[in-house]
Amino acid sequence: MKISFENSTIFAKIKKGSGTSMKKIELLAPVGDFDSFYAAINNGANAIYVGGKQFSARAFAPNFTNEELKKLIQEAHQKEVRVYIAVNTLVFENEISTLLEYLDFLYLNDADAFIIQDLGLIDFVAHRYPKIKIHVSTQQNVFSVNQALFLKKMGVHRIILARETPLLVVKEIINQVGIEVEIFVHGSLCVSYAGTCLHSSIIGKRSGNRGKCAQPCRMEYTLFEDGKPKSEKKYLLSMNDLNTLDKINDLIESGVTSFKIEGRMKSAQYVGAVTKAYADSIHYYLEHKKLLDTKTISQTLKLLFNRSFTKGYLLNEQNDKLTSTYRPNHIGQKVGKVIATYPHKIKIQLIEPLSQKDKIVILQKEDVSFYISKMKVKEKYVPKAFPNEIVELEVHSLIQNQADVYKCLDDQKLKEIELANQQTKKIPITLFFEAFLNQPMKLTIMDHLGHKILVQSEYFPQQSQTAFMNETIIKEQLTKLNNTDYRCQRVDCHVEKQLFIPLKELNQLRREAIAKLKEARSIYHHRNISDILLDDTTGDFISKKRNPFLKLAVRVKNLDQLQALQNYPIDFIYYEDEKTFAQAQKINSKVIYSTGRINQKIPAQSKAALIHQVGSIQEKDTHLLIADIYCNITNSYTVDVFLNNGIQHMGLSPELSKDHLYELVQKVKERHHQLPCFEFLVYGRLQNMVMKHCFIAKNYQLKEKQCHLCHVHQYALVDRKNYVFPILTDSNCNVTIFNSKTLHLIDEIDFLYEIGIDVIRLDFSVEEPQKVQEVVQLYWDKIHHNQRNDEIPEATYGHFYENDL
C-alpha cells in the first residue's frame, strides 16, 4: 500500500505571476540519538536526517547502529516523518564493499533518501538504486545554476545548497533548474566553503571530508600584516550561529522545498526547541500571512545555544556581523551587569529574570561560570529575581566590576522543553465495528492517509438474555489506545442486540488491528533485493601512449612567478589571476587558466582550463578541461564521473595516502585495463581553507569587504603554536588560508610513476621567483637525472603516510 506524504507536509501558497501554486515546505530536523529523535518528531519536524556508525559527516555524534536505524525508520514512518540517511563523507577505494552492504541494508529497510557528498557515490547510487532519492550534501559545495544542472543530469533529486549562497541565487537555481532545494535555516556555520576545508585534516589529521573535523576554526589566531601582529589573539574564524526566524516569510516565498536545522551533535532540548520554534513560525505565517512575534522564542534559542546570531550569507549579512571574535562557544542570554564586588559576593543589576539552579557566566579576561544555589534581593533569600532588581550572589573567584553577566542555562525552561519533547502527538483514526449472531466480529480501522485495516475475530458472538454487551462498553473498550500512537476521532458500531461478547475478544481484535495498521504505516516504499541493479558503471577512455618520464605541472599565482618558469620546459602551467591572464599568455603561450576554488568562469582566450567545480564541465565542448586536485577524487567511481564527461586528465585528492592512492589506481586498471592521465601534488602549500568571509576587513572594523588592503600588504594567521598560515585573496575577496608547512614528496616520485601517475604537480603560492626556480630545478633534476640536491625547510609529507583520516 503506497503512502502519500501530502497530508503531513506544510503547504504554502507561492505566487507566480498572476497565478498561485501550492508549494510544500518541509521542516528537516537533526537527529544524533534517540532522545533527539523523539524531540524532533514531537515538536513538528516532518523529516529528519541521521547518520550511521560509518560514512557520516558527524563521526563524533552518537549516531546509530544498523538495527537502530531500522527501528528508527519504522517508527518515523509510523509518525509520517521521512528519514534521510547521511552518507556524506568522501569514500576511499578499500571502503566500497563495506559501503555497498550498508547501502543495501538502508535501501531494503525503507530509507527515504541518501545524503551524499562523493561524486562517484552519487553516480553509483543513481545506477544501483533506482528507487531511492539522492540528496546532494552541502559538502559538495553547490552554489550555482551550472552545478545544479550538472547534478540534476546525474539523477539527483535534491540539492542542499552551500551556506554561502544568497537568497537571490537560491531563487535562480529553483527557477532555472527545476530541482528540489534545501537550505540551512538555523545552527552552526562553517567559515570555509563546505567540502573545501582541509584545515582540520592537515593540522590535526582529522578530516572534515571524512566526518572528523576538530574545528580548528574555533581556535585563537593572531592576524599578522607584513610580518607584524595586527590583532590580539582572537577567534578570528569563529562564525556566529545562523538564525533566520525573522525572515521566514522571505524563505517560504522563495520556493525552497526544505528548511534544514543544523545540530546532529546538539542536545535533545536544543533539537526540540529549535524545531518547535520553526514549526510554529512556519505554520503562523502560512495561516496569517504575517510573521509570528518571536521575541520569547528567540530568548529561548539564545539560552539553548548561540555564539551570537547572524542572518548569514543567505540573507546578505554584513561581513562584520558574521563572526564573534572574542569567544567561540555558547554565550547564552545577557541578564545583567556586575555593579559591585566584595571579597566573597557580588551584586548584579538585572535586565532579565534569574532563578535558582540557573547557570550564569561572567564575561571577563578569565570567564567565571557557576550554577546559582542561592541568591538575595534586598537582603532576603529569594528563589527568583526579576528585571531591574539587584541580586546578590556568593562567589569564590575574583570578579571584575562592570563585567557583563549572561545566563547560559535556564533550569525551568529546560524542564518545560523536556516535557514538550515527551508529548507524543497521536495519530487520528476512525473505527468501524460490527457484530452479528454466529458471525465473526469485524473491526475496520482507517487513517487520514487512506490505510484501511480489516480484522475478524475467531470468536462468534452468542445471544444472551442477561450478560449481553451494550454499545457504550464496546466503544469504551475499542478506544483504549493510551499505550499506542493513535487516538480515536470517531467510532461507529453496528451490533445486533443482546449479544454476549467477552471483553478479551474486543481487546484482542483492537490489538490485532492496531498492529496491522502500524505495520502498514511503517513501510513506505516496498522495495525488494531485485530492485538493486548490479551493473558496474564504466568510464569512457581515449587511448594514450605513456611518456617515458613523469610530466611536470606547475601552478603559479602571479606574473613574477610565471616569469621565473621561462627557462624550463614545463608540460602544464596553470595560472589563476583572470585580470592578468592575457599578460600571462604573452609571457608563456602554454599557460592554462585555473578557475580557482570558487570561480567557474573560463576566459574565452584560454583553450584549456584547470577546473575545480562540476559547474565548469559545461565548457567541455569549447575548452580542454583538467580536473584539479581539489575536486575531491578519492575513488575509481569519481574518476568515472569525470571520464564520462570528457575529462581525461585529472588531479587526485591530496587527502589520499600512499596506500589509498595505490588502491584507487589499481582499481581503475582492474576495471578498465588502462588509465587516464592522473596528476598528483608533490610540492606546495595546501589550501587549508577557502572562505567568503574577510576577517582582514573585520579586524580593521570595516563593515564590508573590498577594502583592498590585501593588495598592498601580505597577511598571515599565526596560531597558538606559532605556526604561520599565509593568506591570499582573489578579485572577489574570497580568502584562501594556506598551510603553514610545504608539502614535499620528492622521494616518492619514482613510486608515483610506477603505479601509473603521469603528471606530478608543483603549487606555488607565496614563494618568491628565485624560490620557484630552485624548486622547479630540484624536481626537474630528480625526474630526468634522478638527482636530489637540496632540502626544503619546514616541509611536510601531508597525508601520504597517514591511512586513518
Tell what function each PLM region has.
Residues 2, 6-13, 18:
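Short, positively charged and aromatic/hydrophobic N-terminal segments
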Residues 19-142, 160-258, 265-805:
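Active-site pocket-lining/capping segments in soluble small-molecule metabolic enzymes
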